[in-house]
Amino acid sequence: MRAIISLLLISAMVFSIIEAVPEEEGLQLSEDERGGCLPHNRFCNALSDPRCCSGLRCKELSIWDSRCLG
């Protein structure tokens, strides 16, 4: 009987925590997660997403440094 009551209390607490977070907040994604583009002078990788914004290209400045430049 105690186990059932404890389980019900834990379920109620978890549900109240989930309801406390607004739905819109949980759906907001960062620019990178949405597959957006990278602005000027940001680190990039020409072989993987996200890509540089239109008008910019991922230019290799050295072996370890590539940036979105115009």
Swiss-Prot record:
Prosegment residue ranges: 21-34
Modified-residue entries (Leucine amide), positions: 69
Disulfide pairings: 37-53, 44-58, 52-68
Pfam families cross-referenced by the UniProt entry: Toxin_7
Protein keywords: Amidation, Disulfide bond, Knottin, Neurotoxin, Secreted, Signal, Toxin
Subcellular location: Secreted
Superkingdom per UniProt: Eukaryota
Tissues expressed in: Expressed by the venom gland.
Any one GO MF annotation of this record: toxin activity
Signal peptide: 1-20
Major localization listed first in the record, in broad terms: secreted
UniProt GO cellular component terms: extracellular region
Family listed: Belongs to the neurotoxin 01 (U2-agtx) family.
Free-text comment about domains: The presence of a 'disulfide through disulfide knot' structurally defines this protein as a knottin.
Biological role stated in the UniProt entry: Insect active toxin causing rapid but reversible paralysis in crickets. No activity shown in mammals. Does not show effect on mammalian voltage-gated calcium channels.
Listed name of the protein: U2-agatoxin-Ao1l
